[in-house]
Amino acid sequence: TVNPAVPEGDIYKNMKVKKSCNVVVVGGGTAGLEAACTAAEVGCNVFLLEKKNHLGGLSTFISDLPSKTRMKDFPKYLEARASRLHNLYIFLNTEATVEMVKRFKPDIVVNATGSVPLVPPIPGLKENIAEGNVATIFDMINNLNAGKYPDDFCKGKEVVVVGGGSVGLDVIEYFAPRGAKCTIID
């Protein structure tokens, strides 16, 4: 997501494309925004297509967790950077199709469409997600935003988190201080 040239400062901005170049970036999360800004800064004409009505992707979504509110800062920085680039065109509420991408006559297409939660092949897990007994991180944040997790909701409940990576730890960081008994399976 973050430009690898950062340790070198803005040295990559001194590099310019030698001929006209059209870049289509599909996805307006932080990776897509970074790719779009970097390509525009070196002289490419960039067309960023985002299906939602806002930019920032998962970083903006995850920032709804109380301990992650500062994650909104990076997408805001990227949006400000993008707004200064007159050769970067952003299309919100635009689902990319092959035909649409072809209309921009791209020399390069960047797939920055993000990710979906991995649902491990545990028997019955998918059915329990559908019934609402099991939640993905997306479900959890949507429920949090909908007010379904008041502070006393967790007290005394057992929460099992499958996956001990950063997202799993974010979930534990939310539930444990609110009195839930938490178990991580990794």
For the regions a language model picked out, list residue spans one by one.
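Rossmann-like dinucleotide/flavin-binding elements
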Residues: 17-49, 91-105, 113-122, 137-186
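Short glycine/proline-centered loop/turn elements that form peptide/ligand docking sites
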Residues: 55
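Residues in the short beta-alpha loop(s) of Rossmann-like NAD(P)-binding domains
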Residues: 52
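Flexible, Lys/Arg-rich cytosolic regulatory linkers and terminal tails that connect or flank
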Residues: 1-5, 131, 138, 149-150
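Ferredoxin-type iron-sulfur electron-transfer modules and their immediate structural context
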Residues: 1-24, 58-77, 111-128
